[in-house]
């Protein structure tokens, strides 16, 4: 099977306005999370941030995705440390990562609470989770079906789920406010003049001029949300942390269990040390 058409679609999608803006947003979150740290470990879940950065000597990046074609594309584009894994069962030891970024991943997972608990488990104490998800269930459309989405979120719902899964919320904001009203108009128009057609994948690209204009507008929004939370938009972005000093059950190989106390001789207690 020729994978070239699929790779071309992924390459075109990677240069679209939303993917470009999301990439900048997630990279900023990682830069903030690892600032001043040595040998920091970061997971790019969904490979949305493309974090193969110059400071690779101080930041170790793991690119994770559940799709083999997507990982193959990232390998062609030069990404390293690629792994195919599920958001609901990452397969890493607890407390492994200083930061995790997940660009538009949570809405694809059948059990998003299970995925959030798994992300929390592999984060180090105080570690940062930055994620983006599509906003508002009433904006659900053919594109969501074509992309395999399970749901859309409100900021309140996302905040509640993160809190219930043990995260401390730093900030939650809407994003792509400039595209919110056009999305409502388009959604209403499609509802009024719906046709019986199969769902199709809709590109977030468009003309180069429109793409560049949207990138510039979202650059402005990205700088704006440093100071205020936007009240509406077509995406939700959240910064959350795993609370510090939270004990986690860690599975350690038997040969590494140097902390294990050998069993006491029969009849001896902690108050009766062996003096011989």
Which residues does each PLM region occupy?
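Short, glycine-/aromatic-enriched active-site segment of Class I SAM-dependent methyltransferases
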Residues: 7-11, 129-151, 155-163
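A C-terminal cap/extension of S-adenosyl-L-methionine-dependent methyltransferases
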Residues: 179-256, 260
């Amino acid at each position: 099977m020729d994978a070239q058409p699929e790779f071309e679609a992924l390459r075109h999608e990677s240069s679209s306005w939303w993917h470009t803006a999301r990439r900048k947003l997630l990279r900023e979150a990682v830069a903030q999370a690892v600032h001043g740290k040595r040998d920091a470990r970061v997971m790019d879940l969904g490979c949305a941030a493309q974090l193969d950065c110059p400071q690779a000597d101080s930041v170790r990046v793991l690119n994770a995705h559940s799709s083999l074609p997507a990982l193959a594309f990232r390998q062609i584009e030069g990404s390293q440390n690629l792994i195919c894994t599920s958001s609901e069962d990452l397969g890493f030891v607890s407390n492994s990562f200083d930061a995790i970024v997940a660009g538009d991943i949570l809405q694809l997972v059948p059990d998003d609470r299970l995925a959030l608990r798994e992300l929390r488990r592999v984060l180090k104490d105080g570690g940062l989770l930055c994620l983006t998800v599509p906003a508002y269930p009433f904006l659900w459309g053919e594109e969501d079906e074509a992309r395999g989405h399970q749901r859309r979120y409100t900021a309140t719902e996302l905040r509640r789920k993160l809190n219930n899964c043990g995260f401390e919320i730093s900030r939650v904001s809407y994003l792509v406010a400039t595209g919110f009203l056009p999305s409502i108009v388009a959604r209403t128009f499609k509802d009024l003049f719906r046709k019986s057609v199969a769902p199709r994948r809709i590109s977030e690209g468009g003309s180069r001029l429109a793409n560049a204009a949207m990138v510039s507008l979202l650059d402005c929004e990205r700088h704006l949300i440093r100071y205020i939370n936007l009240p509406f938009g077509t995406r939700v972005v959240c910064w959350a942390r795993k609370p510090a000093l939270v004990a986690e059950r860690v599975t350690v190989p038997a040969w590494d269990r140097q902390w294990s106390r050998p069993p006491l001789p029969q009849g001896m207690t902690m108050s009766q040390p062996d003096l011989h």
